[in-house]
Amino acid sequence: MVQLTLPKNSRMRVGKTWPKPEGATNVRRFNIYRWDPDTGENPRIDTYFVDMDKCGPMVLDALIKIKNEIDPTLTFRRSCREGICGSCAMNIDGGNHLACIYGMDEIKGDVNIYPLPHMPVVKDLVPDLTHFYAQHASVQPYLITETPTPDKEWRQSIEDRKKLDGLYECVMCASCSTACPSYWWNGDRYLGPAALLHAYRWIIDSRDEATGERLDSLEDPFKLYRCHTIMNCTNTCPKGLNPAKAIASIKHMMVDRIV
């Protein structure tokens, strides 16, 4: 039988339990992953109690309340607070969500919060997305043309423009890629659902003139074909997009140009 031994500093330990708010009757318990690279200590799970009668309805509201009123050392990303910027993606109650639009009423019992899976951690709930962004850049997510730029806009029919619906709305939160087991196993070479969704968005753009080159760049055993239609990406996308369908469409295009 294979035996695996985790590095000593990877084992999570029980952290600090903060006191409950006095006089509160509607209290939720939050178990939150904590790790500070500057201390050299193991990751830990700290426990906080929040008076929900004095807190907004979203998970991000509770995190902000914890940081402002209980523990200012808690670190996480956030910005727009309305599901547009993608900054506050994290693993909540076992699934990847945007904390700003994930309601407390969707969670039963304790609230368990971790950083996005698979990614290196910068600190606490902040993942290092350097590799994720590099993969996105590798698909050249912009218009490539040889035709001289027109005096006005690049014209596009209503039908061609409609093909981009369900693709351009991605907020680059990384929830889909970090929910994908294939990305966990082959993240160094498999581009992942987010990057491939963007690749398809430009491949089918009627104004783009580099379709062949884009498909050539994806003709690789790992970049595209490590997708095994597990569908975690589609199930977890906070914008309701379907990266798995986009990936399947690219595969069909690969076959169509050969047959």
UniProtKB/Swiss-Prot annotation:
Cofactor(s) needed for function: [2Fe-2S] cluster; [3Fe-4S] cluster; [4Fe-4S] cluster
Residues annotated to bind [4Fe-4S] cluster: C170, C173, C176, C237
Pathway: Carbohydrate metabolism; tricarboxylic acid cycle; fumarate from succinate (bacterial route): step 1/1
PROSITE patterns: 2FE2S_FER_1, 2FE2S_FER_2, 4FE4S_FER_1, 4FE4S_FER_2
Coiled coil: none
Keyword match Oxidoreductase: yes
Binding positions for [3Fe-4S] cluster per the UniProt entry: C180, C227, C233
UniProtKB keywords: 2Fe-2S, 3Fe-4S, 4Fe-4S, Electron transport, Iron, Iron-sulfur, Metal-binding, Oxidoreductase, Transport, Tricarboxylic acid cycle
Positions of a ubiquinone binding: W185
Protein name as annotated: Succinate dehydrogenase iron-sulfur subunit
Native source organism of the sequence: Paracoccus denitrificans
Gene: sdhB
